[in-house]
Amino acid sequence: MSHKISPALKNLPDIDSWISIDVAIRGAQYHFIHIKRLLDMFDTGATKISVSQMNWLIRGFFWELVGAFDLILQWVNKRFQLEVESNKTRKWETIDVGRVQWSRVKRSRAKIAPDLWNNVIQYLIQVWESEWYFEVRTYRNYAHKSLFEMTEFTRTDGKGNSQWFISLAREGQGYDDLRILLPSYIEEFERLAANLKDLTGK
């Protein structure tokens, strides 16, 4: 049996892509607020349901961030009219979102502002190859396949909160408490969005 995607979910809606990108980054912040709340509760004794909730939230956190990067790809495809789409349809009013993937975008030429596109894609390649985005992608991919195991480090002096860790995503990555690690990824994404807006005059 062959199924076809509904046009409503196949084509890019006519909205400002930066709204969607900002919504995804705010979505990760929302998840972190609730993750931090649960971590604070864990210090008084975690329940089985709160462990499940933690996994839902951590998985959602990384899905939102990778979603933000995918939305950036949709934006650059539309903004620069990349050959990702023009090779197939030559129409820019119907952009097939499924075709807009990193493997295609990074080698595409721009119909609009090709010199600016060269600067933008070089910056996006730096982000893609960065340690932090490798970690985010790895955590997101892992979240599709398994739940996260958490390790607690409890202070023996009883002063201060426990520290909570998930497994390392990258060889050579340092261990950081989730209260430090997760906000650092949000900060990187905020920097990415701000730099792209500055670079493109958005």
Describe each PLM feature range.
Residues 1-37, 44-63, 71-202:
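Acidic, Ser/Thr/Gly/Pro-rich intrinsically disordered interaction regions
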